[in-house]
Amino acid sequence: MEFREMMEQREQSQACLDSAESRQDSTFRQMRRKRQQLAEEASIAILEKATAGTLALLGDNDYPYAVPISYVYHERKLYFHSALAGHKVDAIRKCDKASFCVIEQDDVQPEKYTTFFRSVIAFGRIHIIEDEGGTHDVDNIVGGYHEKLEVARMLGNRYNPNHDEALQKEIENGLSRMLAIRFDIEHLTGKEAIELVRGRQNND
C-alpha cells in the first residue's frame, strides 16, 4: 500500500471517530462539578505540554494496573513505547479499554487543607501497533512498521528535538526491540480546583 493511501485511510478512520465522538461521550459519566471542568482545548493543551502520565489498564487477575509512562499526544491520540514483553503488554492484549491521567498542577495549601490542582483524564481504546508482514527497510517502509517508525520519531522529537542524526541512529539500533502503542481517545475530561477557577474569574 502506498503511503498516500495509508494516510487517506487514516483520515477516513479519524473522520469516523470524530462522527462517533458524541455517541461515545454519552457512554461515559459526566463531571458532577461542571464549574471546575476544563474546556476541551485546555485539556488538550495539558496533554500537549506534559511529558508523562499514568496509564491505567486491567492487569493480572483483573486487578487495576496503573503505570507511569512517557508519551506523545498527536491528533486525539496518545502514543507510547514499551519493551517487547511485560505486565503492561499482557494487559493491553487482554483488554483494550484504558484510561490515562496527567497532573499538570498540584500545589499544596497547608493552611487551607487543600491543593490547587489541575489534571486531565482520557478514556479510550489502546492497541499494540503490529508490524508483522511489513518490511524493516527504512527506505522502503510498508504496513504497520511505518506507523511504528512514525511513533518512534514523534517520541524522539518530543523529548530530544532537532537531533535527527542521533535519533536515526537510535531508531536503527533499537526499533526492533521496542513496541509502539496507540491510545485512541474516546472521552476526555479536565478539572481544576475551584480556587483556580475563582482566581481566573477575578482576573478577567
Per-range role (PLM):
Residues 26-54:
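Short, basic/aromatic recognition patches
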Residues 3, 35-36, 44, 87-90, ...:
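Anion-coordinating catalytic cores for phosphoryl-, nucleotidyl-, and glycosidic chemistry
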Residues 46-47, 91-92, 155, 183:
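A generic structural signal for nonpolar/aromatic side chains embedded in well-ordered alpha-helices
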